[in-house]
C-alpha cells in the first residue's frame, strides 16, 4: 500500500500554489479591466459617433480642448472623465473639490466652469443642436454630501443618454448629422 502513496507531499503543494497564484493574477486583471470594458460598453450605447481629444475654436479667447464628444440621439454630449478613488466633497458653488481616500487627501478645481466653457464653444459651432456636458466619475468615487449638477456616474449616463427605441434614435441622429459634420470641420486633432 505504501508504494501507491506519494513519497513527497510537497510535490502536490508546488503546483497547487502555482495554480492559486495564476488564479489570483487573473482575478486582479479581470477586476482592473472590467471598469474599462464597462466604460466602452456605455460609450458605445450612448454614442452613435464619437470624437476624442479635439480642439475647437472658443470665441475671441482662442481654442479649447474637449476630451470626449459624442453624437447622441439627444444632441451632442461632452464628457469629462474623473478617475478618482475615495469620498468626493464638492458642490456647484465650491471653487475646489476635495477627495479623501484611505491613504491621502487632495483637492482639485471645480470642473464645472470649464465644462460650461466647452459647452459654449461647441454650441457656438452647432447652434441649432442641443449640447450637454457631464463630468463622469467612475466607480471609485463616492459623493456622500450630495452630487453636483453636471456630475454623473456610468449608470446615470447610460440611463440619461441611452436610447431604447433605436429606430426613433436613428431619425434624430440623421437630423443632427450635418451639425456633427460642422464640428468635425471646425475641430483640430479629430479625424476628418
Predicted region positions:
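Surface-exposed interaction regions that form or flank ligand-binding interfaces
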Residues: 1-64, 70-76, 85-87, 101-192
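Amphipathic, interface-forming alpha-helical segments with heptad-repeat character
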Residues: 82-98
Amino acid at each position: 500500500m505504501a508504494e501507491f502513496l506519494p513519497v513527497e507531499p510537497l510535490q502536490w503543494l508546488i503546483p497547487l500554489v502555482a495554480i492559486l497564484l495564476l488564479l489570483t493574477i487573473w482575478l486582479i486583471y479581470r477586476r482592473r479591466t472590467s471598469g474599462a470594458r464597462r466604460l466602452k460598453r456605455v460609450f458605445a450605447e450612448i454614442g452613435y459617433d464619437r470624437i476624442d481629444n479635439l480642439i475647437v475654436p472658443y470665441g475671441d479667447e482662442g481654442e479649447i480642448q474637449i476630451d470626449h464628444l459624442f453624437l447622441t440621439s439627444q444632441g451632442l454630449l461632452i464628457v469629462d472623465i474623473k478617475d478618482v478613488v475615495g469620498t468626493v466633497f464638492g458642490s456647484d458653488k465650491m471653487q475646489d473639490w476635495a477627495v479623501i481616500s484611505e491613504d491621502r487627501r487632495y483637492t482639485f478645481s471645480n470642473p464645472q466652469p470649464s465644462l460650461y466653457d466647452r459647452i459654449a464653444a461647441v454650441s457656438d459651432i452647432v447652434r441649432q443642436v442641443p449640447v450637454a456636458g457631464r463630468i463622469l466619475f467612475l466607480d471609485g468615487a463616492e459623493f456622500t454630501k450630495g452630487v453636483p449638477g453636471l456630475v454623473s456616474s456610468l449608470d446615470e449616463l447610460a440611463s440619461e443618454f441611452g436610447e431604447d427605441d433605436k429606430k426613433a434614435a436613428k431619425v434624430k441622429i440623421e437630423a443632427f448629422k450635418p451639425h456633427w459634420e460642422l464640428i468635425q470641420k471646425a475641430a483640430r486633432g479629430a479625424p476628418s
